[in-house]
UniProtKB/Swiss-Prot annotation:
It comes from the Bacteria. This is Small ribosomal subunit protein uS10. Belongs to the universal ribosomal protein uS10 family. Part of the 30S ribosomal subunit. It comes from Campylobacter hominis (strain ATCC BAA-381 / DSM 21671 / CCUG 45161 / LMG 19568 / NCTC 13146 / CH001A).
């Protein structure tokens, strides 16, 4: 039995929440205990570019990207739990980081 920590990141929070719900459902079917999902702080990356290619430095445009995150802890994971997680079909726009913790 071990503890597994999943960190999920995505640009769209709706896709992220659907993915988290699918993971929680799959883990609970195997009998493991789930802690979370814990919402992580949203990271905002802002980019400022000039509108004009030559002059008018005062005229600028600003763009931003928001990266939403969730964290799940799976307590007392069994080999069946790990197998169900590997077979799970997740959205391609969600980045999943898996870390096996100690007991």
């Amino acid at each position: 039995m071990q503890k597994i920590r999943l960190k999920l990141k995505a640009y769209d929070h709706r896709v992220l929440d659907r993915t988290v719900a699918a993971i929680v459902e799959a883990v609970k079917r195997t009998g493991a205990d789930v802690r979370g999902p814990v919402p992580m702080p949203t990271k905002v990356k802002r980019y400022t570019v000039l509108k004009s290619p030559h002059i008018n430095k005062d005229s600028r445009e600003q763009f931003e990207m928001k990266i939403h995150g969730r964290m799940l802890d799976i307590v007392a994971a069994t080999p069946e739990t790990v197998d169900s997680l590997t077979k799970l079909d997740l959205a391609p726009e969600v980045n999943v980081e898996v870390r096996a913790m100690g007991k």
